[in-house]
UniProtKB/Swiss-Prot annotation:
Family label: Belongs to the EF-Ts family.
Name of the protein in question: Elongation factor Ts
PANTHER family: ELONGATION FACTOR TS, ELONGATION FACTOR TS, MITOCHONDRIAL
UniProt keyword list: Cytoplasm, Elongation factor, Protein biosynthesis
Protein biosynthesis found in the keyword field: yes
GO MF annotations, alphabetized: translation elongation factor activity
Lineage: Bacteria, Pseudomonadati, Chlamydiota, Chlamydiia, Chlamydiales
Cell compartments where the protein resides: Cytoplasm
């Protein structure tokens, strides 16, 4: 046996998160030198990561976080739900959010090249490789977003299904509308709107919807067809547009009415500037 103690073996395992067998192999290869063993394991991780890159990654988590300057959003995928709930993997994702907020990056490439806050001696992509060795699965950073914080604004975050679906809402007109912003984010996850408002629906989407409706009511007088099309189009807007949808917590209120009521009560002029809905693999 090489000249290293159980305490050194334990320290190496704690520092790297790698299994005892690999840690022992590293210490034996490096003559018991802890620092060299860490480097050995990192190189081993980078090498073994390449062998896993081709594996499918259909599971994972979506996570979001805000600070005083902005909001970070990320999707990271792995092979199995078991690893998606692994503490090491979740810590890795949590630190990725910190990196996005620190560097204000909004692409996978920019994030991957940045120095990791979890281990500044490694880039994010190098740490991804080391983490792949630890959890034994391919890890893929699928998408990244960063939203700078606007003046007098509030961001709401709602996560569902242990990170399988996440919604963000950006409200203008108030910096203290946290409860409202989170309620609307929760509503977005439940109702899954396609558009913010009627005005934001593309003309081609409206034209396509009219074609579908018209094909269902052929043979009726033109004035009747026009009334039916108008009615069905309004139903389409109520289903597809966030501001038109009935609030999930109180169907008597539309989301627009909910915002109007808050604005009157708070004396502010609140509006939804943007909403984002991410689902794993979508």
């Amino acid at each position: 046996m090489s000249d290293f103690s159980m305490e050194t073996l334990k320290t190496l395992r704690q520092q790297t998160g790698v299994g005892l067998t690999k840690c022992k192999e590293a210490l034996e290869a490096c003559g018991g030198n802890l620092e060299e063993a860490v480097v050995y394991l990192r190189k081993l991780g980078l090498a073994s990561a390449g062998k896993k890159e081709h594996r499918e990654t259909k599971e994972g988590i979506i996570a979001a976080k805000t600070d005083a300057n902005g909001t970070a959003l990320i999707e990271v995928n792995v092979e199995t739900d078991f690893v998606a709930n692994n503490a090491v993997f979740r810590e890795f994702v949590s630190n990725l959010l910190n990196d996005i907020l620190k560097y204000k990056v909004d692409t996978v490439e920019a994030l991957s090249q940045a120095a990791s806050s979890q281990d500044p001696s490694l880039s994010v992509d190098e740490l991804r490789a080391v983490t792949m060795q630890t959890v034994g699965e391919n890890i893929r950073i699928s998408r990244v977003a960063y939203f700078p914080k606007a003046t007098n604004s509030t961001v709401g975050i709602y996560s569902h299904g242990n990170g399988k679906t996440v919604a963000l809402t950006m409200l203008s007109g108030s910096s203290t509308a946290d409860s409202l912003a989170k309620d609307i984010a929760m509503h977005v996850v439940a109702a899954q709107p396609q558009f913010l408002s009627k005005e934001s629906v593309p003309a081609e989407a409206i034209a396509k919807e009219k074609e579908v409706i018209a094909s269902q009511i052929q043979g009726k007088p033109q004035e009747v067809i026009e009334k039916i099309v108008t009615g069905k189009l309004n139903t389409f807007f109520q289903e597809a547009c966030l501001l038109e949808q009935p609030f999930i917590k109180n169907a008597d209120l539309s989301i627009q009415s909910l915002i109007d009521d808050f604005s009157k009560t708070s004396g502010s002029s609140v509006a939804i500037e943007q909403f984002i809905l991410w689902k794993i693999g979508a």
